[in-house]
Design a protein with these regions (language model features):
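N-terminal intrinsically disordered, cationic/polar leader segments
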Residues: 1-30, 40, 44-115
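Short, conserved glycine- and acidic-residue-centered signature motifs
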Residues: 31-35
Length: 115
């Protein structure tokens, strides 16, 4: 099973992704491919936002298992929306493949937090 832990608040977001979906054999596992695609897209977006100084602090540990991404969003509503979009996408995959993907969300932003 792939485990995805999301820690978030109005100032930061952290994604920890590890494990194996075991939906199909290696190289043919569409669940693993879907999660991997989202993780790589998230890492690329975080890296780009960091390099453009849109987010003040970011770290990516790509060679670790679990894969670990951390970003201080600075309370930027647009950046928080990007992070929330990835949370939604991970949850959708977990909803479609509950035996293969589990998402744990720790903390959340309230509407007032994005100011």
């Amino acid at each position: 099973m792939i485990g995805i832990t999301v820690r978030q608040n109005e100032r930061c977001a952290e994604f920890i992704v590890g494990g194996h979906a075991e939906y199909a054999e290696k190289g043919k596992d569409i669940v693993c491919a879907g999660v991997s695609t989202l993780v790589n897209a998230l890492a690329n977006i975080i890296r780009e936002l960091g390099e453009k100084d849109i987010i003040p602090l970011w770290m990516i540990w790509p060679d670790e298992d679990p894969f670990h991404i951390y970003a201080e969003t600075g309370g930027n509503p647009a950046v928080n929306t990007v992070m929330d979009t990835f949370v939604t996408e991970f949850c959708q995959i977990a909803g479609q493949y509950p035996d293969n993907v589990q998402v744990q969300i720790i903390g959340e932003r309230s509407e007032d937090d994005s100011r």
